[in-house]
């Protein structure tokens, strides 16, 4: 299982210059956000410079996908040993859904910036098969429509906001909105990771942000998400900083994978 990027796939182009103000730009000035985003970017850059990635990026991405799926499932309460996952002995539907999402991200990178609604539906099908009514797979609830439209505008529109923060907003919106009613957390984390890949934060898909969230703890994750859902300045800032910290931890996990491959 891996996150195979299609040949020729490239990071999303830089946002075009515009005289109109960027409505998301003020988020950088929230307490602690700019510093956290810079630290996350620096952590990813250190990972991307690792010499193993010059010859083994596919292997690192494969391992990253596996560890990311395990951590995403663990955040849902389905915590299984990595060794069992490698052996293929795990049948838990939450874990299987997380594995399918991780494995499917690479094929979605090019479509995500153009047709995010289509990709979100596919992510839910992957995550929630065996957990939701087949008729409900890929179909967001009616109440989610207006807010999903806003999210789609965020994903497809230009912004000067760093990619790590755009990924955090995508993740937070989906997790807080829970548009599908099942497996929304797995979908949200998959969409957040996909945003980071597509916007050039981690174009090789070698970091493991899901492990970062898991290492910071389920309680801290839930608390930060509740803060974001509150809509307060402090709550939004707290979520963005939390996501940046998870990204830093995820970069360290990627470095650990690189080192393990280097040792053989």
Residue locations for each model-derived region?
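FIC/Doc superfamily catalytic core
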Residues: 1-264
């Amino acid at each position: 299982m891996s996150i195979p990027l299609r040949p020729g796939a490239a990071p999303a182009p830089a946002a075009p210059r515009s005289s109109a103000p960027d409505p998301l730009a003020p988020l950088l000035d929230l307490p602690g956000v700019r510093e956290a985003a810079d630290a996350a970017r620096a952590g990813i850059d250190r990972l991307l410079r690792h010499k193993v990635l010059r010859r083994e990026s596919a292997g690192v991405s494969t391992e990253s996908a596996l560890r990311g799926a395990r951590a995403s499932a663990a955040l849902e309460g389905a915590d299984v040993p990595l060794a069992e996952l490698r052996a293929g002995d795990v049948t838990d539907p939450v874990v299987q859904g997380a594995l399918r999402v991780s494995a499917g991200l690479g094929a979605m990178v090019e479509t995500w910036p153009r047709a995010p609604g289509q990709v979100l539906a596919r992510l839910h099908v992957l995550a929630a098969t065996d957990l939701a009514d087949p008729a409900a797979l890929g179909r967001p609830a009616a109440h989610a429509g207006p807010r999903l439209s806003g999210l789609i505008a965020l994903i497809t529109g230009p912004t000067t906001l760093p990619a790590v923060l755009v990924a955090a907003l995508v993740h937070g919106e989906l997790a807080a909105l829970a548009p599908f009613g099942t497996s929304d957390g797995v979908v949200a984390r998959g969409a957040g990771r996909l945003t980071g890949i597509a916007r050039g934060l981690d174009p090789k898909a070698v970091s493991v942000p899901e492990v970062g969230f898991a290492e910071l703890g389920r309680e801290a994750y839930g608390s930060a998400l509740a803060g974001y859902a509150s809509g307060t300045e402090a709550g939004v800032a707290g979520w963005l900083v939390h996501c940046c910290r998870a990204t830093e931890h995820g970069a360290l996990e990627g470095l650990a994978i690189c080192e393990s491959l280097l040792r053989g």
